[in-house]
């Protein structure tokens, strides 16, 4: 990490299990390079009571209280949980057109539904909002996604399926079984890859590369437990 030509010493801490680096930047250009290798992360994550409560509530980009009437008339809440989660993800996939640059940083799931287009975070926000409106706890997960095209940071959804957090990706741009968790939260407000305080900056260049050993499976709507 370099800022204004000088090495940076980041302060590192955890927020909800995610690693956060806090930096004090010098005037001039700042360059941050990060690399890592990941292996099987262990067993699926159980939904805790605190997570259950938080993941049911409306949030900044996921105003589920505004879409409750729409969701309950559009979907059958009596479906088995895994089937309901997959059905909502498939519906969002059909309803939206993936369009780079089509959405604004302030757009909510309601804006996305009306526009009918967006990028991965918009797909995730709409999926989360509909699931919460159907009383299914759901949250956003920022991930590295081998097989994603175009390659970038990626946003997917975790939903409570019979007490276990399971991933669905309404974009179908990357296989869920190859995803590597970066962090999770209520929505994009909790999971931004970069947040600035006390000054201004321009993002000059961003390059993300994520690869996996072996062949990648075909993306689908089946919920998958992400370690």
Show where each model-derived region lies:
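Low-complexity, flexible helical/coil segments
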Residues: 8-21, 66-75, 174-180, 192-197, ...
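Generic structural "secondary-structure junction" signal
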Residues: 4, 25, 98-100, 115, ...
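Secondary-structure boundary elements
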Residues: 32, 42, 46-118, 126, ...
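Hydrophobic/aromatic-rich core segments of domains that either
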Residues: 90, 122-200
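Linear, non-domain "peripheral" regions
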Residues: 1-69, 135
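Generic structural hydrophobic/aromatic packing signal, biased to beta-strands
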Residues: 1-2, 34, 71, 168, ...
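Short, surface-exposed linear patches
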Residues: 3, 22-23, 53-59, 161-162, ...
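Short, surface-exposed, polar/charged, turn-prone segments marking secondary-structure boundaries
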Residues: 8-10, 27-29, 60-65, 166-170, ...
């Amino acid at each position: 990490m370099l800022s204004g030509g000088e090495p940076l010493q980041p302060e590192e801490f955890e927020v909800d299990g995610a690693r956060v680096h806090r930096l004090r930047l010098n005037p001039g250009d700042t360059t941050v390079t990060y690399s890592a290798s990941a292996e099987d992360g262990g067993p699926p994550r159980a939904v805790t009571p605190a997570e259950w409560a938080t993941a049911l509530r409306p949030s900044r980009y996921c105003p589920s209280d505004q879409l409750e009437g729409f969701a309950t008339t559009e979907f059958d809440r009596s479906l088995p949980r895994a089937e309901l989660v997959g059905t909502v993800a498939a519906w969002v996939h059909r309803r939206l057109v993936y369009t780079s640059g089509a959405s604004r940083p302030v757009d909510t799931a309601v804006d996305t539904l009306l526009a009918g287009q967006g990028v991965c975070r918009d797909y995730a926000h709409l999926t989360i909002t509909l699931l919460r409106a159907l009383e299914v706890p759901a949250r956003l997960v920022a991930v590295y996604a081998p097989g994603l095209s175009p390659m970038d940071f990626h946003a997917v959804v975790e939903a409570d399926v019979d007490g276990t957090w399971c991933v669905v990706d309404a974009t179908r741009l990357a296989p869920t079984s190859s995803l590597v968790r970066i962090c999770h939260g209520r929505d994009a407000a909790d999971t931004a890859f970069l947040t600035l305080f006390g000054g201004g900056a321009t993002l000059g260049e961003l390059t993300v590369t994520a690869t996996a050993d072996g062949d990648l499976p075909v993306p689908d709507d089946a919920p998958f437990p992400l370690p």
